Amino acid sequence: MIMSIYKEEYKNVIAVTNRKLSSRPFLEQMKRVCKLHPRAVILREKDLSEEEYAELAVQILTLCKQYQVPCMLHTYLETARKLQHPYIHLPLFLLRENSENPGDFLAVGCSVHSVEEAKEAQKLGATYLTAGHIYTTDC
């Protein structure tokens, strides 16, 4: 009964990763997250090189598949293509740069911080949006 309550509670949550914030080993923490069955996971590890990201992505995709949690890869279009993964999430500047070429994905997400950005992302082909903070950050 308790687990079904958790599943219900997290069914609309999109978990965005930052392994530096986890006090547990990252894969252990991700297993705990996946067991709660969030709506999706966005693997957002901005400090990794594309090669490092690809290695981590393989592990996280396996874990997400095991728990039937959709996983959106973040930023690295070529990694997603090489892994034949159908979901990508892009910052708006990358969606702008690749608006002609994201068509091979089932879902293209975009992070937006204003209504104007949301409208632009939709015009550029985003199939879903995440709305974040509206103040300046380093991302």
Report each predicted region and the residues it spans:
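Non-cysteine beta-strand/loop elements that form the S-adenosyl-L-methionine
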Residues: 127-134
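A short acidic, helix-capping loop that chelates divalent metal ions and anchors anionic groups
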Residues: 43, 135-139
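Conserved N-terminal beta1-alpha1 strand-loop-helix module at the mouth
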Residues: 1-89, 93-95, 102-127
